[in-house]
Regions:
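N-terminal leader segment of winged-helix/HTH proteins
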Residues: 1-32, 79-81, 138
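Alpha-helical hairpin
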Residues: 3-6, 34-36, 98, 124
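Short amphipathic alpha-helical segments with heptad-repeat character
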Residues: 11-15, 19, 63, 103, ...
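Charged, amphipathic alpha-helical coiled-coil/dimerization segments
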Residues: 22, 74-137
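N-terminal helix-turn-helix DNA-binding core of bacterial DNA-binding proteins
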Residues: 23-65
Length: 142
């Protein structure tokens, strides 16, 4: 049986670490040409086959809360970061594709953001990083 006090301490520590890391990492976006939410959309889209994803998958994979992903995507279309078209397999759905400009903007910021993440995590050993990843996945699965 899980020790309730220990569970609460672990939860608080995890939440505080996430908050502090996020507060620090948000600085990566200060001079960027992408918002955090736009980066998040492009993260999902650029990792998808042919740099194309269903809008519902983009919404489900958002790491940052976004009340209206559809409106965000429409703004990104206007900026030339993504293209949006009807999903031929789902009449009500849409497909989102990263444009070359969107892919370039994403990769530029991803290099900066990736360095920040690597720097912040560098005080952990590889086995600790694997354990952290595995524990986080276990928590997500419930």
């Amino acid at each position: 049986m899980t020790d309730r006090k220990l569970a609460l301490e672990a939860w608080e520590s995890l939440f505080r670490a996430q908050h502090e890391l996020f507060t620090e990492m948000v600085k990566d976006f200060d001079d960027a040409h992408l918002s955090q939410a736009e980066y998040d959309v492009l993260l999902t889209v650029t990792r998808s086959p042919s740099r194309t994803a269903r809008l519902r998958d983009v919404t489900a994979n958002m790491l940052i809360s976004q009340p209206s992903v559809s409106r965000l995507v429409d703004r990104m279309v206007t900026r030339g970061l993504v293209a949006k078209c009807a999903d031929p397999d789902d009449g009500r759905g849409a497909l989102i594709s990263a444009t070359d400009a969107g892919t370039r903007a994403f990769r530029t910021l991803a290099m900066v953001h990736g360095r920040s993440i690597a720097d912040r995590m560098s005080h952990l050993e590889d086995d600790e990083l694997r354990a952290l990843r595995d524990l986080a996945e276990k928590l997500r699965r419930g």
